């Protein structure tokens, strides 16, 4: 590797670099040398003069950043077009994401020297400033040209197919599309924050995009689904059947949440289920409890306890009814004793 800057023909050197980059993102079988690619990047970044021994109007590092930005922009736009051609958008997105993410990790490694120098040089006369590593830039382009493009220009087809798959599982027991979990994970991985340490750049992730693009519509989907179902069931089946159905629904929704969602979504899902399946009909459920006690329907009483224990003051409300029932029952039994004196 060169240790001193040498004059370069930028376009020629960059084209050689981009050829390797296309191989990386195309998942081609051709082998390549990591050192060869890294040397090309290093040669560009340290160069001060062009082939004519003149300073370029724009530093080569800036030109390099613009070129890789254009490459990633074109790459992600092409990927989105390939995804939209498929019938199963979820599967197509998942497969493309796996390849793109691993390719971006590799691309980030070969651009390691470029990444390191971003924090050491400041070309104040050029906007925007270079502050994004190759990896961060690649994921931002995925967010912009794939996720947001599918949302804004294709009727949010990706998330719609996910919610349709989940509804199909609720209605028919059809297993949820196995690729959904990868799509959801991508909403977290695609937002990257960087921290710089002496040993290098460390990447972390945030959940804001996940919350905005998946969690919010998912919670709305749960709310709408169970609002409609509870309104239909509460007046068409017995309270005992409703309680049993609600317990099953909540249990399955919790399992689905643990499989698909991030841990921060768990309580939110529970709260939506409680509101639609329990809280709206709490008084109607409580009104039935004393009758269940009187009829010695103890299994149904247990189910009622399990369901109402999920909501605030549910147990206290049941306890008050039970206490009143015991008082009435005891008084009734005592009356049967007549005037018998108790020793």
Regions found by a protein language model. Name each.
Residues 1-343:
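Eukaryotic scaffold/interaction segments
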């Amino acid at each position: 590797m060169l240790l001193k800057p040498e004059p370069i023909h930028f376009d020629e050197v960059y084209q050689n670099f981009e050829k390797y980059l296309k191989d990386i993102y195309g998942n081609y079988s051709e082998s390549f040398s990591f050192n060869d690619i890294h040397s090309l990047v290093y040669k560009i970044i340290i160069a001060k003069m062009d082939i004519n021994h003149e300073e370029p109007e724009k530093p080569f590092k800036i030109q390099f950043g613009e070129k890789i930005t254009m490459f990633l922009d074109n790459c992600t736009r092409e990927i989105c077009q390939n995804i939209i051609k498929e019938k199963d958008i979820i599967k197509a997105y998942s497969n493309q994401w796996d390849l793109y993410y691993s390719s971006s990790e590799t691309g980030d490694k070969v651009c390691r020297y470029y990444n390191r120098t971003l924090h050491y040089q400041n070309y104040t006369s050029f906007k925007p400033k270079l502050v994004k590593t190759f990896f961060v830039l690649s994921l931002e382009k995925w967010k912009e040209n794939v996720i947001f493009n599918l949302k804004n220009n294709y009727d949010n087809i990706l998330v719609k197919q996910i919610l349709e798959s989940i509804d199909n599982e609720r209605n028919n027991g059809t297993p949820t599309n196995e690729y959904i979990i990868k799509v959801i994970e991508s909403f977290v991985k695609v937002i990257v924050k960087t921290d710089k340490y002496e040993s290098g750049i460390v990447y972390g992730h945030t959940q804001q995009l996940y919350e905005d693009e998946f969690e919010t519509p998912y919670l709305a989907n749960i709310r709408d689904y169970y609002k409609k179902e509870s309104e239909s069931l509460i007046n068409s089946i017995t309270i005992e059947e409703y309680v049993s159905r609600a317990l099953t629904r909540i249990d399955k929704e919790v399992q689905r949440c643990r499989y698909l969602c991030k841990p921060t979504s768990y309580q939110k899902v529970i709260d939506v289920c409680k509101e639609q399946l329990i809280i709206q009909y709490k008084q109607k459920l409580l009104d039935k409890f004393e009758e269940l006690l009187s009829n010695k329907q103890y299994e149904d009483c247990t189910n009622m306890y399990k369901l109402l224990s999920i909501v605030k003051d549910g147990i206290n409300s049941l306890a008050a009814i039970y206490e009143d029932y015991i008082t009435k029952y005891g008084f009734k039994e005592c009356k049967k004793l007549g005037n018998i004196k108790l020793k």
